[in-house]
Regions:
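C-terminal substrate-recognition "lid" of short-chain dehydrogenase/reductases
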Residues: 2, 121, 211-240, 244-245
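Canonical Rossmann dinucleotide-binding motif of NAD(H)/NADP(H)-dependent dehydrogenases/reductases
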Residues: 2-33, 168
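The beta1-alpha1 cofactor-binding region of Rossmann-like NAD(H)/NADP(H)-dependent oxidoreductases
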Residues: 39-40, 60-71, 103, 216-217
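Substrate-binding pocket helix/loop in short-chain dehydrogenase/reductase
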Residues: 97-98, 102-110, 192, 203
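Alpha-helical segment proximal to the catalytic Tyr-Lys
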Residues: 126, 170-174, 231
Length: 246
């Protein structure tokens, strides 16, 4: 297994895309650490991974808190070793029309989706620079490229994450660290399952491959990007959207 001996932190790993990414990396031999504000959910996923023979642990993590993030990274290096892989997946939505959007909803989405990735990447880079290796993957979104009605805050956070990824990649490349973004389209998760059937059908009509994506589609892309097969790929945004945006 290619990731044997690797330590991988996945934020927002308790459910959805993060859970599937965690399971996939564990199958390849990594010790996955699920950082999530939903600690009970993270522990449940950890138990499932361990039940299949994988290595996993859970930590409670509020990615928008600098103190929380530093504490988690300090504990990783104390209990294991410097982190090898970080997947910044934690994210939320608070949708609403721009003219009606509350400042608190703008701030919350930007703090978790963008600031959280900055804080985790900053701590990861400090550890990775010392060992002159590592991979950081930021989970962006198709919405960060094309925008979406009623998602000014979410779109801004994901567009910012894409720009952040490119700058991060330039800064850490001389130390042997790679950074890429994965931009999923509309994926069949809790976020899309709440949509009305008619809305889902209209979305699918816009997708050339005629289906919503599955979390596994995103996880396989992440697994490729953290592998040695992608050793010459950095600063890129990989779209996983069924052709909805080309």
């Amino acid at each position: 297994m290619e990731l044997n001996g690797k330590i991988a932190l996945i934020t927002g790993g308790a459910q959805g895309i993060g859970r599937i990414i965690s399971e996939d990396l564990a199958r390849q031999g990594a010790h996955v650490i699920l950082g999530d504000i939903n600690f009970d959910g993270a522990e449940k996923t950890v138990a499932e991974i361990k039940g299949r023979g994988g290595k996993a642990s859970a930590v409670q993590l509020d990615v928008s808190s600098a103190a929380d993030v530093q504490s988690v990274f300090d504990s990783i290096i104390k209990e294991y070793k410097p982190v090898d892989i970080v997947v910044n997946n934690a994210g939320i939505t608070r949708d609403g029309l721009l003219v009606r959007m509350k400042e608190v909803d703008w701030d919350l989405v930007l703090n978790i989706n963008l600031k959280g990735s900055f804080l985790c990447s900053q701590q990861a880079a400090k550890q990775m620079m010392k060992q002159k290796s590592g991979v950081i993957i930021n989970i962006a979104s198709i919405v960060g490229i094309m925008g979406n009605f009623g998602q000014a805050n979410y779109s801004a956070s994901k567009a910012g994450l894409i720009g952040f990824t490119k700058t991060l990649a330039r800064e850490v490349a001389p130390r042997g660290i790679r950074a890429n973004a994965v931009a999923p389209g509309f994926i069949d998760t809790e976020m899309t399952q709440v949509l009305e059937k008619s809305v889902r059908e209209k979305l699918i009509e816009q997708i050339p491959l005629a289906r919503l994506g599955q979390p596994e589609d995103v996880a396989r892309c992440v697994s490729f990007l953290v592998s040695e097969n992608a050793s010459y790929i950095t600063g890129q945004v990989i779209n996983v959207n069924g052709g909805m945006l080309m």
